[in-house]
Design a protein with these regions (language model features):
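Amphipathic alpha-helical interface surfaces
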Residues: 5, 24-31, 45
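Generic recognition of well-ordered alpha-helical segments
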Residues: 11, 30-33
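A short, surface-exposed loop/turn module that caps and links secondary-structure elements
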Residues: 33-59
Length: 90
């Protein structure tokens, strides 16, 4: 699947590039690759979100941060919405 990034996710990627520890940056790279290959399974504890975030998925980068993304199967696209903080922190 193709990966696209929202403007907020692009800002988060830049933040990680400038401020992130190597372990987290490497994990983000691995998780994004996995998401492109199989968005609903794999490492980072993929989780379908519910309530006001229904239709979105998350994967753990570390204890505090998550990748939040949407799977648009009709377009064969994964839209990454966020790469920092926990979804309840937004």
């Amino acid at each position: 699947m193709e990966i696209a990034y929202s403007p907020d996710a692009q800002k988060d990627l830049e933040w990680w590039r400038l401020n992130g520890d190597e372990s987290s940056k490497n994990k983000i790279t691995r998780l994004i690759q996995e998401i492109s290959e199989h968005p609903k399974t794999g490492t980072g504890k993929p989780e379908a979100l519910s309530h006001n975030l229904a239709g979105l998925w998350s994967r753990r980068i570390n204890k505090k941060d998550r990748i939040i993304y949407q799977i648009l199967e009709d377009k064969i696209l994964v839209l990454v919405l966020s790469l920092r903080n926990h979804y309840s922190d937004k």
